[in-house]
A protein has these predicted regions:
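The feature marks proteins involved in alpha-glucan
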Residues: 1-63, 67, 87-91, 96-145
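Short proline/glycine-enriched turn/loop motifs at strand-loop junctions of beta-rich domains
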Residues: 71-78
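Conserved aromatic beta-strand anchor motif in extracellular beta-sandwich/beta-rich domains
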Residues: 80-82
Length: 145
């Protein structure tokens, strides 16, 4: 049985697109799958696009400190390290929630003098392929040594 695909309106309006209609349909299907994935994982495209407001380093006025959050659903264990802890890989363990978000809280009382703008850091991730040092996905600035 042959799959019937509804013709995209743009192809109906522009006959010059008919030779590439199959490729356009594949791209459109891939787009729809990705949008469905985003809807399931983030709730909406807006929430997905605003991830930078939740992930990475975020100041918490109520708790008076910084949160570091990273989405790593397949990770078994995650640590954060950097110049603020003398690059000790396994000193600060992050905690995983049910959605696969790993987080660590840095109270200002303890880290005010060590954690500052321009601090260098990485995450140490234990996955199926072993331990790796990574640059966090939501890092806003990276430097190469």
């Amino acid at each position: 049985m042959e799959k019937t695909t509804r013709r995209l309106p743009i192809v109906e309006r522009d006959e010059w697109l008919q030779p590439v209609e199959a490729q356009m349909n594949l791209r459109h299907e891939r787009y729809e799958r990705k949008m469905a994935d985003i809807g399931r994982s983030a709730g909406s495209l807006v929430d997905y696009a605003n991830g930078y407001r939740y992930f990475g380093w975020q100041w918490d006025d109520v708790l008076d400190g910084w949160w570091l959050r990273e989405w790593l659903p397949g990770a078994h264990d995650v640590y954060v390290f950097g110049d603020f802890n003398n690059w000790q890989r396994t000193e600060i363990r992050m905690h995983k929630d049910a959605a696969g978000v790993w987080s660590a809280f840095f109270p200002a009382a303890m880290y005010r003098d060590r954690l500052r703008h321009g601090s260098l850091y990485k995450i140490h991730v234990h996955g199926d392929n072993g331990w790796l040092d990574r640059i966090p996905a939501y890092a806003r600035r990276v430097v190469q040594d």
